[in-house]
Amino acid sequence: MIKNPKVLILTAHYGNGHVQVAKTLEQTFRQKGIKDVIVCDLFGESHPVITDITKYLYLKSYTIGKELYRLFYYGVEKIYDKKIASWYANFGRKRLKLLLQAEKPDIVINTFPIIAVPELKKQTGISIPVYNVLTDFCVHKIWIHREVDRYFVATDHVKKVMVDIGVPAEQIVETGIPIRSSFELKINSDIIYNKYQLCKNKKILLIVAGAHGVLGSVKELCQSFMSVPDLQVVVVCGKNEALKQDLLGLQEKNPDALKVFGYVENIDELFRVTSCMITKPGGITLSEAAALQVPVILYKPVPGQENENAMYFERKGAAVVIRDDSEVFAKTEALLQDDMRLLQMKEAMKSIYRPEPADHIVDTILAENHVEPNHIPIKSPALAQSFT
């Protein structure tokens, strides 16, 4: 039995999702009395220049680099073999060896497809349990390695795909994707309407525009939606200050029709009162939407995991997928007017959601390593007041 295990969580800053999952798992371990938890951006620390370049290319995949990313994602999936695995395993390997020697973790968790640890296990024979937490509603072969002890996945569909690839079913646990605990709290919606100055007698359309300009023509969209009766548009610009300032002029003209925010710390509050949301199909965003049963309109998914996520939610009846700018207004307005379909989409979201995924994952890991959790109760936070 390990009394005070040290946990190493490896992640990467490609989008916010992988890091957010790592932080959620870290917080969950700490809540259960496991204090020695380290979160490391292995690629960023090992190869900062290469990481900056690849992060730039990743962001460009939203605009000019879609075909390049399609080729990378699906091309690597088709030709992935031992040579590619060996080449990829060298990324971060030197830093990893130093990290393992210095920290001597008892448990390693990947929230990004980093195969350096299982590859090191294979080559050196070190005995350390390795867990992969998949952060999308699909699986790429790059996540899979014989030396990974267990995989935590979003859905039974992902599990079936992995079994077909050759992963033993007993190594895969369907838990859902870890999300922030705030999305699983109960909050009085009246408080939210008052806090954000929203109209209870209007439907609310939430547009999550993001900080990297991944949602096109936001201003024009807002102008169109502002003409729809009994609709209030809420735009979250993230850290895109230029977009926020551009939209504030529209808000001043008709504050009852449009509300503009920058970065919203407790965005779950807006999820709770929206009728539907326009967003990109990231795995964490979709998991959060499923937790609060928010129908989603998925805007122009990038080829790769975004497209796979979007197709899964579309098949389940939980999402409308937009692949052309000209479709956004008409399809969104039609959905907002169709209460029956909105209800069906909410039910579909409910069927996808898996409650308390972070707890499920952490409890499983601790049980497998014979650790007795010492749960530290945490009071439910008061409704956050900070948003910009």
UniProtKB/Swiss-Prot annotation:
Identify this protein by name.
Processive diacylglycerol beta-glucosyltransferase
Q: Which reaction does it catalyse?
A: a 1,2-diacyl-3-O-(beta-D-glucopyranosyl)-sn-glycerol + UDP-alpha-D-glucose = a 1,2-diacyl-3-O-(beta-D-Glc-(1->6)-beta-D-Glc)-sn-glycerol + UDP + H(+); a 1,2-diacyl-3-O-(beta-D-Glc-(1->6)-beta-D-Glc)-sn-glycerol + UDP-alpha-D-glucose = a 1,2-diacyl-3-O-(beta-D-Glc-(1->6)-beta-D-Glc-(1->6)-beta-D-Glc)-sn-glycerol + UDP + H(+); a 1,2-diacyl-sn-glycerol + UDP-alpha-D-glucose = a 1,2-diacyl-3-O-(beta-D-glucopyranosyl)-sn-glycerol + UDP + H(+)
The protein's annotated pathway: Glycolipid metabolism; diglucosyl-diacylglycerol biosynthesis
Q: Which NCBIfam families match?
A: PRK13609.1
Keywords, A to Z, come to: Carbohydrate metabolism, Cell membrane, Glycosyltransferase, Lipid biosynthesis, Lipid metabolism, Membrane, Transferase
Q: What is its EC number?
A: 2.4.1.315
GO annotations of cellular component type:
plasma membrane
Stated family: Belongs to the glycosyltransferase 28 family. UgtP subfamily.
Q: What function is annotated for this protein?
A: Processive glucosyltransferase involved in the biosynthesis of both the bilayer- and non-bilayer-forming membrane glucolipids. Is able to successively transfer up to three glucosyl residues to diacylglycerol (DAG), thereby catalyzing the formation of beta-monoglucosyl-DAG (3-O-(beta-D-glucopyranosyl)-1,2-diacyl-sn-glycerol), beta-diglucosyl-DAG (3-O-(beta-D-glucopyranosyl-beta-(1->6)-D-glucopyranosyl)-1,2-diacyl-sn-glycerol) and beta-triglucosyl-DAG (3-O-(beta-D-glucopyranosyl-beta-(1->6)-D-glucopyranosyl-beta-(1->6)-D-glucopyranosyl)-1,2-diacyl-sn-glycerol).
What's one GO BP annotation on this UniProt entry?
enterobacterial common antigen biosynthetic process
| Origin organism lineage | Bacteria, Bacillati, Bacillota, Bacilli, Bacillales
Q: Which Pfam families match?
A: Glyco_tran_28_C, MGDG_synth
GO terms (molecular function) for this protein are: 1,2-diacylglycerol 3-glucosyltransferase activity
Q: Which InterPro entries match?
A: Diacylglyc_glucosyltr_N, Glyco_trans_28_C, Glycosyltransf_28_UgtP, Pro_diacylglycrl_glcsylTrfase
Keyword Disulfide bond attributed: no
Which compartment or compartments is the protein found in? Cell membrane
Gene3D superfamilies attached to this UniProt entry: Glycogen Phosphorylase B
Q: What is its main location?
A: membrane
The reply on keyword Lipid biosynthesis is yes
Which CDD domains does this entry report, sorted A to Z?
GT28_Beta-DGS-like
